Amino acid sequence: VKKPTADENVRVERLLDAQDKAAQLFDEIERREMIRGGIGEQQLSDEINALAATMFGVTRHWHRRIVRAGENTLLPFKEHPPDRAIAADDIVFLDFGPIFEEWEADFGRTYVLSDDPDKHALRDALPRVWQAGRDYFESHLDVTGAELFDFSVEAARAEGFGWGSHIAGHLVGEFPHKKIAGTATEYYIMPKSNKPMRRTDPSGRRCHWILEIHLIDPQRRFGGFYEQLLDLG
């Protein structure tokens, strides 16, 4: 087992700081009313990328930047839909993984540009399902990724929504965590991820997790997304 590269207290501090900066970025996106009708998803992504560079000097993201609007919000991360213009009454979600001084953040939120009650209902359910997942994680000390995935899907169903992804989260850490830990099923919150989530990675570091919620309303043709650190904060 390799010696961990950073003291665990420092790792926790850095991961929380990275998430705090991501939250500040998203707050500024809202304050500037950047999510607006009439622009394309890619244009908004580029504008947010420029804002992250201005605010925090961010030049890299550990995964591709995701801006999804309208029917594209039904699609999981792995899909690559054509660029879509954001409509004035759209639902939009952002999923960004900025790197702050070599530490990864992963943050996702959903925004509704109209008074549509169905879109607001889905958006408002997202943090409730996320919190239900965290509560389950906190109360089940030996929980596996597969168990938390199953619980999260059921929590979504209890709110009246479908589940839009093949995962409910993943490992996060020093960049690049995928090279440090690998991309095996056990490093995701997903079916067949059967190891206890409270464990160390191959380098001897404690595993820290992102919980991500992707709710969909297939009948009304839209979805929403919400993610942040599961075990910290």
Model-assigned labels for residue ranges:
Residues 1-233:
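Active-site neighborhoods and metal-handling regions in enzymes and metal-associated proteins
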